[in-house]
Amino acid sequence: CVDNLQNNIVDERDSFWLREIEKVALNQSKHTKVLSALAIDNTPERAHELLLKTKYWSELINPYPERHKIYPNEELTLDFKEVTREDLTHLKSFAIDNSDSSEADDAISLDGERVWIHIADVATQVDIDSELDGYAQKRASNLYLPDQTIHMLPPNLSSFCSLGESKKSSALSVGFKIIDCQINDIKILQSEIEVVKMSYEDADKALKEDQVLSKLNNLTKSHKAFRNNNGAIKLDLPNVDVKLKNKKVDIQIQTESESRKLVAEMMVIAGRVIAQYATEHKISMPFLTQEVGSFSEDIIQNKENLTATQAFQATRCFKQSKITPKASLHAGLG
């Protein structure tokens, strides 16, 4: 076996030792005699390297989820709940996302002066301390990998709750009026909506033609300017999407389009509205806060036109954000 592995060849007689090496690569074992005999460190990385060299593993095998004990997707048998909901199906609710996105978490709409932000209503289906709650706690969040997505919730529940999967979708809707960038007349309710799913590319084209999207875009631009005047700093650092397509790594630079800015700002507004509602109604919840950073005057004065080098340098000037039970300033968001 050692002779074979030294020459990067294997046969069926080596299967036992290869499985032992595989356990090290997956962090299921800390040591195997064969790696020591080969003078190779007993680490997951070196074991992985050897398995690739011998072609026992394909380069398409992703050991990291199992290595880090990340729970895989599982289907659970679920009884979906039905609750009384406010009918908002008369509104055109836009769910804007990447063209290859399979699930929609949020949507936006306009009803006269009232803005609505709709969020997939997952919480209705998850009872505290239930099997489903435990499932989600083990995973904490969705994990987006180049070759797969590991969901926080069972895929069948994610599909059920995703907006736009059927003619009518269940949502938690946050409605409010915004005048001179001040939020008032907040309503939060469980709703039923009709969703129009759009890619960012299609939304960019529709911004000038669709009155609802055009009004929402103008609103978010005003709100962004309001935050900037109150000290907000957003660094436009490059982002990329890394995916595995047709057994090849595909890297695409995310373009900063009008519709991406629109959706991002609407989510900032949603956080502000919910925080204000919770404070006004004395509802206990976690608040994300951040103290004022230590930025130079040059960065503050030129924050809209920073070079890439200046932007990367500025990342070191932010104070660490904190989650607290008390509402307070988030300096980075203004």
Q: Can you annotate each of these PLM segments?
A:
Residues 59-74, 280:
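Reverse-transcribing Pol proteins
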Residues 3-7, 19-24, 36-39, 67-68, ...:
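Electropositive polyanion-binding surfaces
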